[in-house]
A protein has these predicted regions:
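N-terminal capping/linker segments that flank leucine-rich repeat
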Residues: 4-8, 13, 19-117, 134
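Residues on the solvent-exposed faces and adjacent turns
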Residues: 95, 122, 132, 143, ...
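Short, intrinsically disordered, charge-balanced linker/junction segments flanking boundaries
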Residues: 148-155
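Consensus "Asn ladder" position of solenoid repeat domains
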Residues: 101-102, 123, 141-144
C-alpha cells in the first residue's frame, strides 16, 4: 500500500512540474515566463535596433524600456491565451501613437498567431516581414523607408 501511494505521489509531482517546463525558458531565449519565445525574440530584436544617434527603438517607445521586461515595451498590447501563453495581439508604433519616434530597422512578425493589428506608419523602418498571422486584419506601414515588404498567409 505504501508503495502504491508513493507511486501516485510521484506521478502527481511529475504532472505539476510538466506545465512549468512547457512555459519555461529555453537556454537560447531570454523570454520571461509565459511569453511566446519566438514573438519575444523577434520583438526584442526590433526594440534593440538603434538609430543614427545610437538610441534604441525600445527607448524611443518608452523611457522606462527594459529589454528583459516586455511590459515596458511601448506600443504592444499583450494577450494571455487560455493556455497561459502571452502573445502580442496589437502593435502600434505609428507616429500617430508615438509622435517623433523615428523607429528604424527591420521588423519581423512571422508566426504571430494572435496578432490582430500592426500600425507602424511614419517611421524609418526599412523592412517588414509578416507571415502566418491568421488573425491579422489591420495593417498600416505607410510613410516608412521600406526597401523590403512581404506579407503571406495572413487574414
Amino acid at each position: 500500500m505504501k508503495r502504491i501511494i508513493s507511486v501516485i505521489l510521484a506521478a502527481m509531482m511529475l504532472f505539476m512540474i510538466a506545465p512549468t517546463a512547457a512555459h519555461g525558458k529555453r537556454a537560447e531565449s531570454r523570454a520571461p515566463y509565459g511569453y511566446v519565445e519566438h514573438e519575444y525574440d523577434q520583438l526584442l530584436a526590433f526594440m534593440e535596433q538603434t538609430n543614427s544617434a545610437g538610441v534604441k527603438n525600445g527607448t524611443q517607445l518608452s523611457s522606462a524600456y527594459d529589454p528583459n521586461d516586455p511590459e515596458t515595451w511601448g506600443g504592444i498590447f499583450w494577450y494571455i491565451a487560455p493556455t497561459g501563453f502571452i502573445h502580442a495581439e496589437y502593435i502600434f508604433f505609428s507616429t500617430y501613437d508615438f509622435p517623433n519616434r523615428n523607429l528604424v530597422g527591420t521588423l519581423n512578425l512571422s508566426g504571430f498567431s494572435k496578432l490582430r493589428a500592426l500600425g507602424c506608419a511614419g517611421n524609418s523602418i526599412t523592412a517588414v516581414s509578416i507571415s502566418d498571422c491568421p488573425l491579422l486584419d489591420e495593417l498600416n506601414v505607410a510613410q516608412n523607408l521600406l526597401t523590403n515588404f512581404s506579407v503571406s498567409n495572413c487574414a
